[in-house]
Amino acid sequence: VIDLLHMIDLALFYMGYPDPQHVLAQTFNDFIENKGFKGPWGIPDVADGVTNVESAAHGFIRFTTGQVLSYQVSWAEMNKREEVSVTFQGQKAGGMIRRLFNVDGLDETAIDDCELYVQENGRSVNRSIITEPNEDMGRIRAAQNFIHTIEGVEAPLNTPDQALTLMK
């Protein structure tokens, strides 16, 4: 998984970056050369550009902590609506992060969900996590943090150990 790693990264953040124990996954690039297939994604910015990333990935990860994570991410596959989602489960909580597109590939048509599932006082409690929209998807803040980290002003948003866990 190269291009579609973002949902796994987000789920690992919520899970506390546990160490992976087993990974079962499959990537697909069935539609990568078909420029007319569903939506504007995957099209090179220049005429001679290369399209050499996956178009979909599905997988299941078990961690040494006993937590599990399943994911479905794509920008082009045979389905009703494009969906990018990850579900995670542990002993104290579970959750789901999902982006469902009304028009494939167009972020402005997407519906975002982020939910946390817990037990409180013997009752199931489902919480929707609502955040302010961020048009740059955190890119400006991440770049600022990188500079501030080098300057010694801030701690990094992501550590090298977290990046290594993500790549495993």
Where are these regions (language model features)?
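A structural signal for well-ordered alpha-helical segments within the folded catalytic domains
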Residues: 2-9, 137-144, 161-168
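Short, hydrophobic secondary-structure boundary micro-motifs
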Residues: 23, 98, 127-128, 157-159
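NAD(P)-dinucleotide binding in Rossmann-like oxidoreductases
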Residues: 47-57, 62-142
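Rossmann-like dinucleotide-binding domain that binds NAD(P)(H)
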Residues: 1-68, 73-80, 161
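C-terminal helix-rich "cap/oligomerization" subdomain common to oxidoreductases
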Residues: 64, 130, 145-168
